[in-house]
Amino acid sequence: MNINLDRTSSGFCIGVQGTIYAAEEKLQQEGGLYSFGDIVHNEVEVKRLEALGLVTVDERAFRELRDAHVLIRAHGEPPSTYRIARENNLTVTDTTCPVVSRLQRTTRLLFELGYQIIIYGKQSHPEVIGINGQCNNQAVIIKHADLSDPDELKGLDLAKKSALISQTTMDVPGFYELKALLEARFAQYLSSEKSAWMAIRDIDITAAMTGVLSMPSLLFKDTICRQVSSRNQKLHDFSLANDVVIFVAGKKSSNGQVLYHICKEANPRSYFIEEIEEIEERWLRNSDGRAVATVGVCGATSTPMWHLEKVALHLEKNFAQ
């Protein structure tokens, strides 16, 4: 049995790398640091950092902190978080991912221009909470690209000029499926010549803010992180190339769920684990009881490479022949 570790399309993305590096640096300097929410959606990595002095706090505990040092994670935060930090004299280490920061700015400016904000994303995801905060928590948030959940559409006003954006870790095909269905729905309400949606760039928004450009009433901006989405095809191919795939990610990881689904579609013998102890020997054997020839180990953008290496080493020591 050969164990193949994916080093090209697994492991921390740049945004998470920056957050972890900043946390380690602050912990080394000060010996302690608060993180507002899980620093990354990976319990194994959270435990490692907590052993170094990181303390994770929820919203209630965050509001009660005074004169402390707090880290803002890569997911970003709404304006209200920074207001509380100022009021409570908190020192903030802001590690919001640059891609997320640009998305927050886009959302804020479009809202100021009078657009109804539609977010393709998960309502409870920290990144979406931060984005929604840029538009006074008035965004219409849609998780199901096929519009199969009517509750998600209750706040949608077809009479308003609207802009569609996305949580950075959602899937590209889903975004464009949602865009097409929204176009059709708005077309039923508006005249056909007014229902065309225009793709916009940051420069277009800036021009509109200064009055140089007049934008149409229906817009969309594909804000999905390409560093994340580019992994999709690579993981698909990696899964096809191995008899069995062990996908390693935190159970809370949104990106992990998306990438695991891609692996599972490519190779039905793909298995999701968070901890090494979850691996079952029967996964690694064929129906005749013989060991499979190849096992691939891969993971999400929130999975540390050290943990992937640990899983691969465990497989080599205990199952490889």
Swiss-Prot record:
Reaction(s) the record says it catalyses: isopentenyl diphosphate + 2 oxidized [2Fe-2S]-[ferredoxin] + H2O = (2E)-4-hydroxy-3-methylbut-2-enyl diphosphate + 2 reduced [2Fe-2S]-[ferredoxin] + 2 H(+); dimethylallyl diphosphate + 2 oxidized [2Fe-2S]-[ferredoxin] + H2O = (2E)-4-hydroxy-3-methylbut-2-enyl diphosphate + 2 reduced [2Fe-2S]-[ferredoxin] + 2 H(+)
Matching InterPro entries: LytB/IspH (IPR003451)
Residues annotated to bind (2E)-4-hydroxy-3-methylbut-2-enyl diphosphate: H41, H75, H125, T168, S253, S254, N255, S302
Annotated positions binding [4Fe-4S] cluster: C13, C97, C225
Binding site for dimethylallyl diphosphate: H41, H75, H125, S253, S254, N255, S302
DNA damage recorded as keyword: no
Biological processes, Gene Ontology terms: dimethylallyl diphosphate biosynthetic process; isopentenyl diphosphate biosynthetic process, methylerythritol 4-phosphate pathway; terpenoid biosynthetic process
Cofactor(s) for this UniProt protein: [4Fe-4S] cluster
Binding-site list for isopentenyl diphosphate: H41, H75, H125, S253, S254, N255, S302
UniProt keyword annotations, A-Z: 4Fe-4S, Iron, Iron-sulfur, Isoprene biosynthesis, Metal-binding, Oxidoreductase
Pathway participation: Isoprenoid biosynthesis; dimethylallyl diphosphate biosynthesis; dimethylallyl diphosphate from (2E)-4-hydroxy-3-methylbutenyl diphosphate: step 1/1; Isoprenoid biosynthesis; isopentenyl diphosphate biosynthesis via DXP pathway; isopentenyl diphosphate from 1-deoxy-D-xylulose 5-phosphate: step 6/6
Function: Catalyzes the conversion of 1-hydroxy-2-methyl-2-(E)-butenyl 4-diphosphate (HMBPP) into a mixture of isopentenyl diphosphate (IPP) and dimethylallyl diphosphate (DMAPP). Acts in the terminal step of the DOXP/MEP pathway for isoprenoid precursor biosynthesis.
Protein family per UniProt: Belongs to the IspH family.
Protein name, per record: 4-hydroxy-3-methylbut-2-enyl diphosphate reductase
Organism: Pelodictyon phaeoclathratiforme (strain DSM 5477 / BU-1)
Lineage, top ranks: Bacteria, Pseudomonadati, Chlorobiota, Chlorobiia, Chlorobiales
Gene name of this polypeptide: ispH
